[in-house]
Amino acid sequence: GAYGQGQNIGQLFVNILIFLFY
């Protein structure tokens, strides 16, 4: 996302999902 803080949270969330699924 391009919301600044939301970008950080979204990136962490995606990283966790990738870590769990892969």
From Swiss-Prot:
It is found in: Secreted, Extracellular space. Keywords: Copper, Oxygen transport, Secreted, Transport. Hemolymph. The keyword Secreted applies. GO terms for molecular function: oxygen carrier activity. The keyword Transferase does not apply. GO terms for cellular component: extracellular region. Belongs to the tyrosinase family. Hemocyanin subfamily. Hemocyanins are copper-containing oxygen carriers occurring freely dissolved in the hemolymph of many mollusks and arthropods. This is Hemocyanin subunit 4. The lineage of its organism: Eukaryota, Metazoa, Ecdysozoa, Arthropoda, Crustacea.
